[in-house]
Design a protein with these regions (language model features):
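A detector of single, family-specific signature residues
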Residues: 1-431
């Protein structure tokens, strides 16, 4: 039985950072009560007291996560998340003039749940491991973005006063690059140290590969040719060293995040399913589990998962007008993860590489080809997820042959193009 059918009262919850507006209506749409509550312990005590008389209460709210949603789920009510774009339409339906108040917004949500909620899906209590994994992975990505910002700031400073240092290292996310700036913060310090100290530094940090060692030594030798004013050097070198120290601290925290994520992921029964995906590796597999979750009833078919990931296009048809466009309203984290998976899978799956290459030859852009490949992977992932099985390249090929998959038409007679510069070298599967 649909839990919605058991509801006797419907609440609209217009949430904000420090307070929330609530309207409760009955099955006829009559407003039973309305109140504003603070987002505090006392405020949530007020919520429980005022809603205790409505044991079968459904709540509509414009978000599916956050502190307010956690508190609502703890109070044992049915929570129905509403897309903000849909909520805006419901508000406009209730007030064509455009008049807007928080109380009106809460009422519009409550009445929308009363009238249309039979087609909505209530939030289910989350698997604790999945919930923590999702938050950790999203925060890890945020920290990586912070690291990228710090690296850009460091490189810009070096470009202004110390271009030799910027030129000497290609990857500024490496500790050896930061150590160089800390050891030789200025071109003058580098020149004064001399050749023997340069060689010692490179050997200590295992930067003595023949193809790069000679080039770096040449760069160090001409570092003093770039002339900059003394005040600029003094200020920017102080700034650059500060950025290196920030990067070092942040890198330590990223390593701690990685250990926690990998431990949580390994403890979940679905880890083998997502971990078996070609190209997923220790970073993408936990993100996939965190975003897709473990509730098998959430997506009735692969199409629902594809829409959530943003790989399924949006079609608009009216009269003789028909256009197809990119889906913007989706789970951005899941879309980014699938994009990376599609890119990395080409190095390990022949069919994925052939499929991508064929789409590029047909004129598709890199992003379009990867999105199409991600669409194919999501169909596979959904089936693996539903059946709790690992990716089997031989079974996949057998299914392609049995069903006459059109992907097989992309298989060339010659080996696929290699993309070694983008991927680590791993065994190729023939899926």
């Amino acid at each position: 039985m649909n839990p919605y059918a058991e509801l006797t009262h419907f609440a609209g919850f217009d949430w904000a950072k420090d307070h929330h507006d609530v309207i409760i209506v009955d099955v006829q749409g009559k407003i039973i009560t309305g109140f504003r509550m603070d987002h505090t312990v006392e405020g949530w005590r007020t919520w429980r007291e005022k809603t205790a008389a409505y044991p079968r209460l459904g709540v509509a709210i414009e978000t599916s996560f956050g502190a307010a949603v956690e508190q609502l789920l703890e109070s044992a009510v049915s929570v129905y998340p509403v897309n903000p774009a849909s909520a805006k339409r419901y508000r406009e339906r209730k007030c064509a003039s455009g008049n807007k108040t928080d109380r009106h917004d809460a009422w519009a949500l409550a009445d929308a749940l009363r009238l249309d909620g039979q087609a909505w899906r209530a939030l289910q209590p989350q698997d604790p491991i999945v919930a923590e994994l999702r938050i950790l992975c999203r925060d890890e990505v945020a920290l990586i973005e912070e690291r990228t910002a710090l690296v850009n700031q460091l490189q810009q400073a070096l470009h202004e006063y110390y271009p030799a240092a910027e030129e000497a290292f290609d990857d500024w996310t490496q500790r050896s690059a930061w150590a160089f700036v800390e050891r030789f913060p200025t071109a003058e310090a580098l020149t004064r140290a001399g050749k023997r100290q340069w060689e010692k530094f490179l050997h200590t940090h295992k930067l003595n590969r023949p193809e790069t060692f000679t080039r770096r030594m040449e760069i160090f030798a001409r570092a003093g040719e770039w002339k900059v004013s003394a005040p600029m050097v003094a200020a920017k070198s102080f700034y650059a060293v500060a950025k290196c120290r920030q990067l070092r601290l942040l890198e330590n925290e990223l390593h701690a995040y990685r250990r926690r994520i990998e431990a949580l992921f390994a403890s979940h029964p679905d880890s083998s399913t997502f971990g078996s995906l070609p190209g997923a590796g220790p970073k993408l597999a936990p993100r996939l589990l965190g975003e897709i979750g473990s509730d098998r009833t959430l997506y009735e078919d692969a199409g629902g998962l594809q829409c959530m990931a943003g790989t399924a296009p949006v079609s608009y048809q009216s009269g003789q007008i028909h256009r197809v466009s990119l889906r913007h309203r989706c789970n951005k984290m899941l879309r980014q993860t699938i994009h990376h998976l599609a890119r990395l899978s080409r190095a390990q799956c022949t069919w994925a590489a052939n499929y991508y290459d064929a789409l590029r030859e047909r004129g598709k852009t890199d992003a379009q080809a990867l999105r199409s490949l991600g669409q194919r992977w999501l169909k596979i992932i959904w089936k693996m997820w539903q059946t709790r099985t690992c990716y089997d390249p031989e079974l996949h090929l057998k299914n392609q042959l049995a069903h006459g998959s059109w992907v097989l038409s992309f298989q060339p007679s010659t080996p696929p193009k290699k993309h070694a510069k983008n991927f680590s070298k791993k065994a190729t599967c023939n899926g």
